[in-house]
């Protein structure tokens, strides 16, 4: 059995993230979505809130689980007995950054193998940060995030 980890801040989960989750769940026997604490970002939702949202929107995917962690992804990889790390990439800028991250993860833990899944063109422009900004400015995010996330975002940011 092949176990994959999909690590991110997911603050909040978007339909782009969800698309990567669904596609990775078809490729790997087990997929654990890992909510990580990104010290470079100011989070709107607590790690537990993000886990709850992800669990709710992936409940129909039998081979998907979700948890939050602190610490390095390379350490989580070993703790979870993972075989591969999944990363979604929207564009060349993402890929350049993700290649650096993959290199560092492999430096820290030679067992870490990273697989890049290109974003569906439908989601190339979406990011959690951009979606939060649109909500703050009163714009519509309909269709960019799951409905439960949209409702929670609007109540949190207005």
UniProtKB/Swiss-Prot annotation:
A Pfam family that the UniProt record links to this protein: CTP_transf_like
Main enzyme class: transferase
Binding-site residues for substrate, renumbered to this chain: 9, 41, 73, 87
GO cellular component: cytoplasm
Cofactor requirements of the protein: Mg(2+)
Involved pathway(s): Cofactor biosynthesis; coenzyme A biosynthesis; CoA from (R)-pantothenate: step 4/5
Annotated site location: Transition state stabilizer: 17
GO biological process: coenzyme A biosynthetic process
Enzyme Commission numbers on file: 2.7.7.3
InterPro entries: Cyt_trans-like (IPR004821), PPAT (IPR001980), Rossmann-like_a/b/a_fold (IPR014729)
Source taxon at top rank: Bacteria
Binding-site list for ATP: 9-10, 17, 88-90, 98, 123-129
Record GO terms (molecular function): ATP binding; pantetheine-phosphate adenylyltransferase activity
Keyword Flavoprotein in record: no
UniProt entry keywords in alphabetical sequence: ATP-binding, Coenzyme A biosynthesis, Cytoplasm, Magnesium, Nucleotide-binding, Nucleotidyltransferase, Transferase
Subcellular location: Cytoplasm
Reactions catalysed according to its record: (R)-4'-phosphopantetheine + ATP + H(+) = 3'-dephospho-CoA + diphosphate
Keyword tRNA processing included in the entry's annotation: no
Chief site of localization: cytoplasm
Subunit structure: Homohexamer.
Name of the molecule in the record: Phosphopantetheine adenylyltransferase
Gene name linked to the record: coaD
